[in-house]
Design a protein with these regions (language model features):
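Charge-dense, helix-prone N-terminal extensions
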Residues: 1-103
């Protein structure tokens, strides 16, 4: 099941206070970048982020979910109504995310 455009727009709006966040469509879903680094994505109308140490610390009870068959597990972000939390989450994760791979 692909992500609805309405859900994408809702998540974008909720993340509007976080700097450097962008999305790129990929096979009906959306990869989320923060400062040019892959932080997670929107899969089947769910916001999932990489399980960095800071993400696990800020969301200790967040369930791990698969974005798609064969992928690595990611953390489900279910606190989408709190814009400040979302900004803090992505800011905290940034330094732990791997640099963009050179081609």
């Amino acid at each position: 099941m692909a992500t609805d455009k309405e859900y994408l727009e809702y998540v974008k709006d909720q993340l509007s206070e976080a700097e450097g966040v962008s999305f790129r469509p990929m096979m009906g879903e959306y990869i989320m970048y923060t400062g040019g680094k892959v932080a997670g994505g929107i899969y089947d109308n769910r916001l999932l982020v990489k399980p960095t140490a800071s993400a696990k610390a800020l969301m200790p009870d967040a369930p791990y979910e698969l974005p798609y068959e064969g992928a690595k597990e990611m953390l489900l972000v279910d606190n989408l109504d709190d814009r400040q939390f979302l900004r803090e989450l992505l800011t905290a994760m940034y330094e732990e995310l791997p640099e963009k791979k050179k081609k």
